[in-house]
Amino acid sequence: MASRGVNKVILVGNLGKDPEVRYMPNGNAVANFTVATSESWKDQQGQPQERTEWHNIVMYRRLAEIAGEYLKKGSKIYIEGKLQTSKWQDQATGQDRYKTEINASEMQMLDSRGQGGGQQGGGDYGQQQNQYNAPQQQAPQQGYAPKPQSAPQQPAYAPKPQSAPQQPAQQQGGYQSQGQQPQAPAYAPKPQAAPQQRPAPAPQQAAPQQNFTPDLDDGWDDDIPF
């Protein structure tokens, strides 16, 4: 499988001139400017040396409009993009001309406030998905961190727990029962007397039966005929 390759450029440098913004017939903006990058080193004799490279930058659409509005000569920026080479024919000589530029897709302004023509730094801009963030003002740096509020201190002493009311020990058999069973009072309640029952009524005696014996002398003989 053949590799498609990578075409990506990252630059951090300063603008050599103000951006030139123009509009194409379809209404899209195009911005052109140059960015200088410098590198320094020491030669064999220990003398410092410096070399500056100039890069041609092109931006399109909304990113080009932002560059024309915020960037000035000397502004320090961060750029991501890709290399592209344009070809055209010279009208005077008829020869082909070539120009290699960096087609920038993302940009970040690195100047702090007050530098680069008084602009505000820290803005991130990109052409992908048409997302653009306005430059943000840097908040003043504080030399200290706010002291966290301490939690309210609790008293150094703990309240003495209240003891449960003591119950008299159970005196049965000379020992205490084990466990957490409630203890009975040391005295036994006086048993209540059972209610007195009335004596059952005596059975009534039957009236004595009288044995009637007729008196033989009382006129019985009058009815007997002889």
UniProtKB/Swiss-Prot annotation:
Entry GO terms, CC: nucleoid
SUPFAM superfamilies linked to this entry: Nucleic acid-binding proteins
Ranges where the SSB domain occurs: 6-111
Region (Disordered): 111-226
Location of the motif Important for interaction with partner proteins: 221-226
Biased composition, class Low complexity, residue ranges: 126-210
Residue stretches of biased makeup (Acidic residues): 215-226
A single GO BP: DNA recombination
InterPro entries in the record: NA-bd_OB-fold (IPR012340), Primosome_PriB/ssb (IPR000424), ssDNA-bd (IPR011344)
GO MF annotation, one: single-stranded DNA binding
Record Gene3D superfamilies: Nucleic acid-binding proteins
Biased composition (Gly residues): 114-125
Keywords: DNA damage, DNA recombination, DNA repair, DNA replication, DNA-binding
Oligomer status and interactors: Homotetramer.
Function comment: Plays an important role in DNA replication, recombination and repair. Binds to ssDNA and to an array of partner proteins to recruit them to their sites of action during DNA metabolism.
Protein name as annotated: Single-stranded DNA-binding protein
Gene: ssb
